């Protein structure tokens, strides 16, 4: 027992805390074990979540709600002030020069709720205010006339038991001002318009503002003599004063008054009412509860974001909020969107569409925001400096790339997106080279043959525009039609590359996507309709007429003849052996008019015409 009692007396090592803090600061500067990146005015600060949460109530609450955020952008705080607060957090040293810089750091510390930094600033202000008052009292006696209780302007103070009287200084330029009853209101308006309230500090609890205090002072001033005269003997010239229509403006300054807005629950004070109002939300007992997972949030915006992200399928959003909104569902990954613009941008990940082009290097992008970021760093653009090589740095792992394509492919590793889609076996890949390797190994496709083919319903192309076409299945060939791409092989038929605006129309999914054969897969639709059959033919009708009409007639004729050459004799003979009543009527009509048409062209045109009448036309 005696041995145990002797071991209870341990020696303390106060330097241990400083050593731990110094090592954490070294790790921050060397970017080791940092798990959060803070963006302030475009500048990135690396830090540790645990250290920030220990020094700031703001970060403590934020990291509780958002635990997986690698990047956090902070608005309303200057870069200079945040750098001082980060240095204070890791070194316990606050090195500030000037009152303006100290004021910015004070506001940032209040916003981030860093109490220790606020205490350090209060100590600094007390040390600097005492010698400052002694030095300025003797110098300003000849220039400024202080207003005492016996004069017309009465000295006022905020309602507080322990606060000292507020000293109001009136600065007047050369000359004499006579204030009469008729002109006192105009003088009050000009004085209130030019007043400068430098510091508002108060120890008591009050919701009154500085403007209310000035109004009270003005009312007591009006209770004095109706006509007063201030001679130039009472004060010296002041260059700060401005003359408006022959009347010198009197500027009132409230010096070193403490914060007006005071929280009675935690004894904190704020200069701005907005910060005070946001702070009071932390004491509110009202919370927003998720009815599905019982998670609670202090702010309504965080609650709504939680519902939209995690419980949209379960009906997390109320019926009132969903009224009038149309849900857009991606047919590739089943992701849901409320806004069609977001849905349209998401589809470009699957289609590979890049409508935004850089005018300098002609590189294309899927989003306009990405193009703007690219323009600021484009080597030949406005944002680049001469003689400097363009580099792209990853903010997550600090990897550097010379080309935008390499940087973009690298970002997929962090986001986890798989934008490259194999339409043959419905597999997704992160990198484009992975998709090309898969096509070569699994499907033996090394190169895609792309040909444009347009077929007409009738043979006289000069009089009728091309509005429909028929494609006969051929293994390993891709037919690219105007605004429509059809890929055909022995296993399936895939229709791709269609304008995504039509995907919002429910008729597309109802009338075209259902009831298709299992071996036929339709990915997109474009200004028209599609009919698929069990046989070896795929009919695509009612294509974009304006795009087809832009082609020369000679090109349309050549494409027509080229496509007819690909027809196999078996299909042609099968169509000739199985004519229907409509075919017989058409033959009699053409014989009467003396038209001579090839059998293959005629049977194919008739087949297309029958298919056109079987489906309604999408608008």
From Swiss-Prot:
Residues annotated as domain BTB: 34-98
Name of the gene this protein is made from: Znf131
Broad class of where this protein is predominantly found: nucleus
PTM section of the record: Monosumoylated at Lys-598 by CBX4 and UHRF2. Sumoylation may potentiate ZNF131 inhibition of estrogen signaling. Sumoylation does not interfere with ubiquitination.
This protein's name: Zinc finger protein 131
CC per GO annotation: intermediate filament cytoskeleton; nucleoplasm
Cross-link (Glycyl lysine isopeptide (Lys-Gly) (interchain with G-Cter in SUMO)): 598
Comp. bias intervals (Basic and acidic residues): 574-587, 595-612
Function: May be involved in transcriptional regulation as a repressor of ESR1/ER-alpha signaling. Plays a role during development and organogenesis as well as in the function of the adult central nervous system.
Ribosomal protein in keyword set: no
Gene3D superfamilies, sorted: Classic Zinc Finger (3.30.160.60), Potassium Channel Kv1.1, Chain A (3.30.710.10)
């Amino acid at each position: 027992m005696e041995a145990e009692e002797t071991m209870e007396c341990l020696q303390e090592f106060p330097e241990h805390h400083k050593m731990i803090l110094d090592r954490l600061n070294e790790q921050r500067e060397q970017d080791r074990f940092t798990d959060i990146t803070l963006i302030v005015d475009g500048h990135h600060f690396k830090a540790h979540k645990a250290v920030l949460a220990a020094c700031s109530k703001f970060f403590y609450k934020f990291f509780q709600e958002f635990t997986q955020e690698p990047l956090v952008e902070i608005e309303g705080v200057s870069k200079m002030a945040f750098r001082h607060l980060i240095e204070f957090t890791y070194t316990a040293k606050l090195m500030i020069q000037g009152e303006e810089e100290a004021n910015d750091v004070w506001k940032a510390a209040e916003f981030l709720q860093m109490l220790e930094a606020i205490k350090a600033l209060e100590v600094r202000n007390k040390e600097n205010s005492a010698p400052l008052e002694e030095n300025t009292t003797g110098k300003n006696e000849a220039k400024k006339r202080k207003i005492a209780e016996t004069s017309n302007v009465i000295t006022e103070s905020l309602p507080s038991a322990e606060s000292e009287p507020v000293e109001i200084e009136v600065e007047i330029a050369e000359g004499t001002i006579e204030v009469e009853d008729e002109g006192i209101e105009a003088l009050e308006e000009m004085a209130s318009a030019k007043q400068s309230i430098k510091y508002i500090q108060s120890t008591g609890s009050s919701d009154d503002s500085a403007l209310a205090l000035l109004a009270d002072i003005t009312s007591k001033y009006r209770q004095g003599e109706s006509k007063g005269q201030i001679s130039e003997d009472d004060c010296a010239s002041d260059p700060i004063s401005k003359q408006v229509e022959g009347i010198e403006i009197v500027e009132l300054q409230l010096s070193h008054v403490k914060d007006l807005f005071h929280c009675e629950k935690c004894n904190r004070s704020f200069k701005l009412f907005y910060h005070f109002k946001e702070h009071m939300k932390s004491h509110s007992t009202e919370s927003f509860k998720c009815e599905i997972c019982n998670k609670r949030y202090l702010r309504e915006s965080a609650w709504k974001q939680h519902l939209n992200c995690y419980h949209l399928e379960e009906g997390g959003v109320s019926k009132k909020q969903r009224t009038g909104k149309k849900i857009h569902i991606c047919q590739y990954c089943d992701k849901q969107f409320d806004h069609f613009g977001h849905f349209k941008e998401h589809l470009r990940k699957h289609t590979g569409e890049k409508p935004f082009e850089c005018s300098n290097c002609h590189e294309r992008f899927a989003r306009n925001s990405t193009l703007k970021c690219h323009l600021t760093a484009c080597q030949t653009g406005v944002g680049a400096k001469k003689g400097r090589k363009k580099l792209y740095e990853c903010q997550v792992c600090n990897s550097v790339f010379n080309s935008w394509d390499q940087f973009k492919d690298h970002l997929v590793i962090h986001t986890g997106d798989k934008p490259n889609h194999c339409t043959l076996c419905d597999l997704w890949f992160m990198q484009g080279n992975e998709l090309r390797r898969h096509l070569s190994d699994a499907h033996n496709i090394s190169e895609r043959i792309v040909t444009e083919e347009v077929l007409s319903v009738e043979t006289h192309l000069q009089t009728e525009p091309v509005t429909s076409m028929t494609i006969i299945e051929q293994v390993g060939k891709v037919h690219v039609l105007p605004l429509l791409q059809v890929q055909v092989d022995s296993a399936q038929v895939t229709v791709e590359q269609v304008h995504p605006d039509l995907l919002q129309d429910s008729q597309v999914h109802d009338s075209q996507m259902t009831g298709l054969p299992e071996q036929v897969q339709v990915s997109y639709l474009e200004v028209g309709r599609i009919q698929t059959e069990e046989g070896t033919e795929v009919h695509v009708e009612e294509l974009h007429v304006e795009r087809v009409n832009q082609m020369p007639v000679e090109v349309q004729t050549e494409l027509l003849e080229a496509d007819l050459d690909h027809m196999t004799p078996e299909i042609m003979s099968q169509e000739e052996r199985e004519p229907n009543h409509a075919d017989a009527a058409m033959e009699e009509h053409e014989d009467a008019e003396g038209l001579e048409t090839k059998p293959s062209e005629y049977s194919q045109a008739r087949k297309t015409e029958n298919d056109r009448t079987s489906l309604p036309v999408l608008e």
